Structure formats: structure tokens, C-alpha cells
Amino acid sequence: MAQDAITSVINSADVQGKYLDSAALDKLKGYFGTGELRVRAASTISANAAAIVKEAVAKSLLYSDVTRPGGNMYTTRRYAACIRDLDYYLRYATYAMLAGDPSILDERVLNGLKETYNSLGVPVSSTVQAIQAIKEVTASLVGSDAGKEMGVYLDYISSGLS
């Protein structure tokens, strides 16, 4: 089950029947210390999500083999499905960034996704390329520090698909 960073730290101590130790408190301090950064980034991403996905597709997929006749994104329906999926990844990576925990990505995004894509013939490498483009576009909008934070969760999705 997905947890935020706070719940994860507290549950770990609770299972052990202990008070929070210095390592746990440092983890919480780090989480709270980046809270404003994560919230500002999420706000910018939310306000620009469609543009982020559109620019990422233009950078990574638009003039590649997958968009040519016979390619996997050829036809409006397939293209729309790709855009929908990329928007979904951006949204859930944003949720994970706010929670400070990638486990929501396992539960809500990655569980069975690679197998589904393979069975449908969706080119995973092109999807990973598009996710990396989302990471680049997002970082240019939210700044270096927030971009690195968001990049952790987009990389997590890419790794889960690879």
C-alpha cells in the first residue's frame, strides 16, 4: 500500500515499538524542508500539464517511426491514447513527489503496465524516451532543484518500464 514519507517513517518506528530515532527524524526534516519546493512544483506542473506533455511528445516522438504510417502511434486514436498515458504518468509522478514516496507508482502505475504494453505491441523504449522528455520539459519549467526532485519519480517510472 502506498504511503507518504511521514506515514512510512512513523509506521517503521511503530512496528519496531520504538520512538523515532535521529535517522527517522532527519528523514522527516528533509521531507518538510523540501515541502514548499514540492508544492510550488506541483502547482506549476498542474497549471501546465497539457503543454508539458505536448512539448515532450514534440521533442521525443512526433517525427519518429512510431508516428509514421504503420507506426504504433499512427492513427488519431493511438496518438490520443499515448497522450493520455503520458499525462497519467506526469500526474502520478506529481502525486509521488508530493508524498515523497514512489510506492504509489508501483500500485497505481507500474503494476502490470510493462506486460500490458508488450501484449499490445506498445514500444516501451519510445514510452521511456517520452517520459525522459517530460522530465526535461518539467525541469525547464519548475527549475533545477524541483526538476531534480520530480526527476526521481519520472526516472522511477522509466526504470519500472525498462
Swiss-Prot record:
Q: Which Pfam families does the entry mention?
A: Phycobilisome (PF00502)
For this record, an example GO cellular component is: plasma membrane-derived thylakoid membrane
Residues the record lists as N4-methylasparagine modifications: 72
Membrane in keyword set: yes
Binding residues for (2R,3E)-phycocyanobilin = 82
The alphabetized UniProt keywords are: Antenna complex, Bile pigment, Chromophore, Electron transport, Membrane, Methylation, Photosynthesis, Phycobilisome, Thylakoid, Transport
GO BP annotations of the record are: photosynthesis
Location in the cell reads: Cellular thylakoid membrane
> How is this chain modified after translation?
Contains one covalently linked phycocyanobilin chromophore.
The conditions that induce or repress this protein are given as: Constitutively transcribed in vegetative cells, not expressed during hormogonia differentiation in red light.
In the bilayer, the protein is annotated as: Peripheral membrane protein
Q: Which InterPro entries match?
A: Allophycocyanin_b, Globin-like_sf, Phycobilisome_asu/bsu, Phycobilisome_asu/bsu_sf
Q: What does this protein do?
A: Light-harvesting photosynthetic bile pigment-protein from the phycobiliprotein complex. Allophycocyanin has a maximum absorption at approximately 650 nanometers.
Assembly with partners or alone = Heterodimer of an alpha and a beta chain.
The entry's family comment says: Belongs to the phycobiliprotein family.
Record's protein name: Allophycocyanin beta chain
Gene that encodes it: apcB1
